[in-house]
A protein has these predicted regions:
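Long, compositionally biased tandem-repeat segments
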Residues: 1-158
Length: 158
C-alpha cells in the first residue's frame, strides 16, 4: 500500500488504502479494508488560476469496509475552483465515503462538490460535498445511495 497505491493484501488482513494526492486513489485490500482518502486539489495560480480537482476516495474491500472520503477541490486563485473528489464505494458492509467540497473560485465559477459514495447492503450512503462559491457558485454534490439496511446520504450545501 502507499500513497495513491493499491493494496493487494492476503485475505482477512485489515488494510487502509493510501491517501493519494489530487487525482490519485488509495485502494483497500481486495476483500477487507477501508478505502483511503483522496488528496486535496492543488491551489490554482499562474496564467489560468484554476484550482486542481480533489482526488477520489478509494473503494473499500468487497466484504467489509468504508469508502474513502473525496478530497477537496483546490482554490482558484484568479480562476475557477476545482471540483471535489468523489466519495469511495463501500463494501457489502460499510458506509460510503463523503464527497469532497468544491473549491472557491475568484471571479469565476466555484467548483462542484463531489458525489457521496454508495453503500450496498448494511451501511449508509456518503454525503455529497458542498458547492464552492464563485461567479456563479458550483453545484452541490448528491448524496450516495444507502444500502438495503441504511439511509441515503445527504446532498451537499449549494
Amino acid at each position: 500500500w502507499g500513497r495513491g497505491g493499491r493494496c493487494v493484501a492476503a485475505v482477512g488482513v485489515w488494510v487502509q488504502g493510501g491517501s493519494g494526492g489530487g487525482g490519485w486513489v488509495g485502494e483497500a485490500g481486495l476483500l477487507v479494508g477501508a478505502g483511503g482518502a483522496g488528496g486535496a486539489g492543488a491551489l490554482g495560480g499562474g496564467a489560468t488560476g484554476v484550482g486542481g480537482a480533489g482526488g477520489n476516495g478509494g473503494t473499500a474491500g468487497l466484504l467489509f469496509g468504508a469508502g474513502g472520503a473525496g478530497g477537496a477541490g483546490g482554490f482558484g486563485f484568479g480562476g475557477a475552483g476545482g471540483a471535489g473528489g468523489l466519495g469511495g464505494k463501500a463494501g457489502l458492509i460499510g458506509d460510503g465515503g463523503d464527497g469532497g467540497a468544491g473549491g472557491n473560485g475568484t471571479g469565476a465559477k466555484g467548483g462542484d462538490g463531489g458525489a457521496g459514495g454508495g453503500a450496498i447492503l448494511v451501511g449508509n450512503g456518503g454525503n455529497g460535498g458542498n458547492a464552492g462559491s464563485g461567479t456563479p457558485n458550483g453545484s452541490a454534490g448528491t448524496g450516495g445511495a444507502g444500502g438495503l439496511l441504511g439511509k441515503n446520504g445527504m446532498n451537499g450545501l449549494p
